[in-house]
């Protein structure tokens, strides 16, 4: 299952299909509508989405509306043999929900690249030391293509700013260029 219908989730879908996985989608109402328009399989409900997949991978941006959007109830609906994957942001998971869910065996395993406190203190973090968790130190995005995309975007933004024509402004109302 893929939660979120953005660029990264679509790339992950290709990998999943290469391994013979059937992909189901969930996300915002708009994301589900776009996925459906693209002919993707949308879960019949949020509950079914968390209860069905062998692997559930999260690909959502963290913003005030998405903070804590994956709840203890959601995790508790996952199968005991399911893997929960989060390479997006730790804040998408309700505070304090993941460790008890893992201890209860739902989901049965987690693969994490993001943590509540980064850099992670490996020796003292109960999630990092959980026997059913695989961790990487927030390096899941590190690919040649991703570096090229990020640095090209940064270069474009700096060049535009130097020409007094900034792009991708979050608060254009304060620009007095």
Describe every region a protein language model picked out:
Residues 1-2:
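Hydrophobic Val/Ile/Leu positions in short beta-strands of Rossmann-like dinucleotide-binding domains
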Residues 27:
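Conserved acidic E/D residue at the C-terminus of a beta-strand in Rossmann-like folds
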Residues 5-6:
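Glycine-rich Rossmann-fold phosphate-binding loop(s) that bind the pyrophosphate
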Residues 30-125:
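Rossmann-like adenosine-cofactor binding region
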Residues 9-10:
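N-terminal Rossmann-fold NAD(P) dinucleotide-binding loop
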Residues 13, 17, 102-103:
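Gly/Ala-rich phosphate-binding loop of Rossmann-like dinucleotide-binding domains
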Residues 21-22:
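Residues at the starts of beta-strands that form the adenosine-phosphate
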Residues 81-177:
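Rossmann-like dinucleotide-binding domain for NAD(H)/NADP(H)
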């Amino acid at each position: 299952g893929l939660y979120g219908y953005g660029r990264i989730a679509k790339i992950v879908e290709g990998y999943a299909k290469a391994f013979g996985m059937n992909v189901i989608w969930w996300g915002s109402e708009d994301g589900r509508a776009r996925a459906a328009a693209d002919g993707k399989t949308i879960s019949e409900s949020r509950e079914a989405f968390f209860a069905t997949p062998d692997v559930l991978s999260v690909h959502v941006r963290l913003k005030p509306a998405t903070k804590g959007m994956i709840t203890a109830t959601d995790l508790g609906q996952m199968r005991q043999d399911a893997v929960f994957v989060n390479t997006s942001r730790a804040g998408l998971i309700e505070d304090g929900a993941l460790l008890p869910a893992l201890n209860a065996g739902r989901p049965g395993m987690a693969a994490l690249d993001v943590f509540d406190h980064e850099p992670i203190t490996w020796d003292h973090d109960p999630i990092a030391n959980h026997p059913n968790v695989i961790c990487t130190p927030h390096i899941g995005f590190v690919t040649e293509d991703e570096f090229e995309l990020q640095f090209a975007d940064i270069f474009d933004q700096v060049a535009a700013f130097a020409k007094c024509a900034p792009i991708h402004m979050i608060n254009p109302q304060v620009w007095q260029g």
